[in-house]
C-alpha cells in the first residue's frame, strides 16, 4: 500500500508530516527503529510513569498488522502511532448484540526531546483518518494524564464495565481497565446508539487485553 501524507505539525521552524504506511510495507530498519523509539518513549527513568512495566514485546506485537503513522526529522523517527483492527462486543438495551469493527490505537509515542511541539496531535490526526475511513468505531486505552487530550478530541470515556472474550473461560471481567477505555464512534450500525455505561468486551490477544 502506498504511503499517504495526511497531517502536519509545525515544530521548531520546520513542518513535519505524518505519513501512513501499513506494517507489511515497513522495511526492517524502519520497523526496528520505530520499536526502539517507542520503547524509549515509554520508559521513565524517574519511575513515576503510568507505564510501570515499560513497553513489552506483547505491546509492540499489538501495534503490528495495521497502519502506522510516522513522523521523521532529518532521517530520524520522532513520533509514531498505529491503528489495528479488533472486534468490540456490545449488547444494547434492546438485547441485540453487535461485534463492532474497531480501529484500535496502539503505541502512540513522541521522542522525549520533541514533546510539546504538536507531533502527537499530528499522529492522532492521521490515525483518526484511518478510523473514520475503515472502521465502525475507534478505541484506545489511555493513561490518566492523557484523558483530557482525548476528551478534547471528541473521544468518549467508557464508564461501564470492561471485559475480554477469552478462548477458555468465555467472557472475563477486566476491572483494572475500567475507566481507561476511550471510544470514537464513527459509523455505527443503523439504529445503534452506544450507552457508555453498559458493558463492553474486546477480543482476545496475548498480553494486556485492552
From Swiss-Prot:
One GO BP on record is:
response to antibiotic
Occurrences of domain N-acetyltransferase (ranges): 21-189
Residue sites binding substrate per the record:
54, 106-107, 141, 176-177
Q: Which Gene3D superfamilies match?
A: 3.40.630.30
Q: Which Pfam families match?
A: Acetyltransf_1
Q: Per UniProt, where does CoA bind?
A: 108-110, 115-120
Which UniProt key words apply to this protein? Acyltransferase, Antibiotic resistance, Transferase
Q: Organism's domain of life?
A: Bacteria
Q: Which residues form the signal peptide?
A: none
Of which family is this protein a member? Belongs to the AAC(2')-I acetyltransferase family.
Q: What does this protein do?
A: Catalyzes the coenzyme A-dependent acetylation of the 2' hydroxyl or amino group of a broad spectrum of aminoglycosides. It confers resistance to aminoglycosides.
**Protein name as it appears in the record:** Aminoglycoside 2'-N-acetyltransferase
Species of the source: Mycolicibacterium smegmatis (strain ATCC 700084 / mc(2)155) (Mycobacterium smegmatis)
Q: Identify the coding gene.
A: aac
Amino acid at each position: 500500500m502506498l504511503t499517504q501524507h495526511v497531517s502536519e505539525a509545525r515544530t521548531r521552524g520546520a513542518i513535519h508530516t505524518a505519513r501512513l504506511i501499513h506494517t507489511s510495507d515497513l522495511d526492517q530498519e524502519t520497523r526496528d527503529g520505530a520499536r526502539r523509539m517507542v520503547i524509549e518513549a515509554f520508559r521513565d527513568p524517574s519511575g513515576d510513569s503510568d507505564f510501570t512495566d515499560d513497553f513489552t514485546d506483547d505491546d509492540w506485537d499489538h501495534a503490528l498488522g495495521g497502519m502506522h503513522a510516522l513522523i521523521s526529522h532529518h532521517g530520524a523517527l520522532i513520533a509514531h502511532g498505529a491503528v489495528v483492527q479488533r472486534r468490540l462486543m456490545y449488547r444494547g438495551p434492546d438485547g441485540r448484540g453487535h461485534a463492532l469493527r474497531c480501529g484500535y490505537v496502539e503505541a502512540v509515542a513522541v521522542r522525549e526531546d520533541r514533546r510539546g511541539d504538536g507531533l502527537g496531535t499530528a499522529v492522532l490526526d492521521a490515525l483518526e483518518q484511518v478510523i473514520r475511513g475503515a472502521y465502525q468505531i475507534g478505541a484506545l486505552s489511555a493513561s490518566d494524564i492523557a484523558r483530557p487530550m482525548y476528551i478534547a478530541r471528541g473521544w468518549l470515556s467508557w464508564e461501564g464495565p470492561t471485559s475480554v472474550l477469552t478462548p477458555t473461560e468465555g467472557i472475563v471481567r477486566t476491572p483494572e481497565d475500567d475507566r481507561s477505555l476511550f471510544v470514537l464512534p464513527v459509523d455505527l450500525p443503523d439504529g445503534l446508539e452506544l450507552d457508555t455505561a453498559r458493558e463492553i468486551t474486546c477480543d482476545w490477544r496475548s498480553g494486556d487485553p485492552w
